[in-house]
Amino acid sequence: MELKATTLGKRLAQHPYDRAVILNAGIKVSGDRHEYLIPFNQLLAIHCKRGLVWGELEFVLPDEKVVRLHGTEWGETQRFYHHLDAHWRRWSGEMSEIASGVLRQQLDLIATRTGENKWLTREQTSGVQQQIRQAMSALPLPVNRLEEFDNCREAWRKCQAWLKDIESARLQHNQAYTEAMLTEYADFFRQVESSPLNPAQARAVVNGEHSLLVLAGAGSGKTSVLVARAGWLLARGEASPEQILLLAFGRKAAEEMDERIRERLHTEDITARTFHALALHIIQQGSKKVPIVSKLENDTAARHELFIAEWRKQCSEKKAQAKGWRQWLTEEMQWSVPEGNFWDDEKLQRRLASRLDRWVSLMRMHGGAQAEMIASAPEEIRDLFSKRIKLMAPLLKAWKGALKAENAVDFSGLIHQAIVILEKGRFISPWKHILVDEFQDISPQRAALLAALRKQNSQTTLFAVGDDWQEIYRFSGAQMSLTTAFHENFGEGDRCDLDTTYRFNSRIGEVANRFIQQNPGQLKKPLNSLTNGDEKAVTLLDESQLDALLDKLSGYAKPEERILILARYHHMRPASLEKAATRWPKLQIDFMTIHASKGQQADYVIIVGLQEGSDGFPAAARESIMEEALLPPVEDFPDAEERRLMYVALTRARHRVWALFNKENPSPFVEILKNLDVPVARKP
């Protein structure tokens, strides 16, 4: 059927379209120079209007577009409109049945996802969202018309509501799922560890996000959560033991974790590994070679001897090397260097040996060629760093030569090799769930190993337990932003905070938490104590009062109670401890550096050495160009890592902390603690 404008109407209307033809599933409007095809699946409405003389048809399209036909005889226009409208509505009715079926399928998909007795991840909801949107884009009717049809209206509204508030729907589902699991598995959460898990711990265990950061403050039971998570995956049938990878940072920590798992989960099939042990396993399986880790890695004295021998050789044989080293040590390091053959000076050798060891280690950790190291250094130090790298190159070469002679690899080489094997597909990861302890200590190199493992299977979950407040190993390559910007680095997911400490009282917690959170770069989290503490739970005391303090402690400390004396450096060990065995024989006193105390706890803690200066705490920044270029950037907040060290020291104690300071030259931390209402005592 066709409708045409009258001759006069066409002339007066001066419109591009003067005729319309009904097609099988659409309408064509045209003129002498223009033609427009309107498929029914784009048509939103048809309006028939009467002007002063002629009729007019309007075809409403998406995006507020309207196509008009003018100048038609009114009676003809009405007949054409009724015929077209009936045809369009018949077609629309048929298409609504198809659309209704598609919409019902989307509701079934939503019901399946939300009805499953499983955690609904962000990735899954994103997938459903994408699938629904794709289905909507493939409907035979414009979505703007779905409200018109009884068979589509309700389903369409439900789909829209779910798409509009998808995050709320996900949270609601997961909250209901979590509550159901905590009830159904109440016995498991009560018995999996020596003490029942608290609600925050249990919720972290149940959380099924693919990338989950569990922030575990000092004494909040992180090991319990890791053990319970492994047990939960087994109990729910979500993984077999060989599909669970448990990673710890040190051999001792891995052994302790193994013991806990055997004791609590009654299985020997889940084994905690260090990152190096994991890399070794990947290399063995992926290359059928059994790499030997160099003996030098565990022999500090032998490493120092190797580096000093090569350093002396370079300086004695090459004038340019000797000149470069003298300049480096005097100008940048500001050391006193003897005249003449300074490389033969034993005191200088002893002082430099640990530095050379550290710098070679940083170069190995970077793993790149000299040009790559130089290119990745900050621009403002690149030229100077380039000179330093050239001085260090022979030492790196000597290290590689020693490894070759031993037919061995070093720790950095292990992880590099493992990443290459994973990227080439020579080892296929069997692990569906990766659980990592002390995640705040992770370095970019170890993060790359995790990424390479997860890349092989996008469904591999990462359950990372750590505490950015206790990140104190930047000198070993730890990069705090891998924790504080966890989801940017490891994919979208959740964060769970373990909000209760079982170690220290509320007063120690209040002081330590306020002290660390003065740095806005640290993640904010709650950490509540189960016991109250009085104002004296943290006390500032003159360092001359150490003997008097130990005298007093000897009067009331029980034989089983531990006293931990902590210092920034080994050489700050108090002289009083030389007589401790005879003067305070009943006191259980241990001394260690704050770094070494990580993971330890005691009834009473005495922090010594709160003074300013070269051996002070906070330690003055003494980084060379090598550290500046090869380690993660230093944080903007003053003494950020030293503050975290102080936090670690404060939170080793169950009952009381004494911070001993130098009255003549006090540490800046003393004033900060005073401002946190920590009292200064004249005597213990």
Task: Explain the meaning of each model-derived region.
Residues 444-535, 677-681:
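Conserved RecA-like helicase ATPase core segment
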Residues 1-19:
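Anionic N-terminal interaction surfaces
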Residues 213, 220-226, 492-494, 500-587, ...:
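Helicase P-loop NTPase motor core
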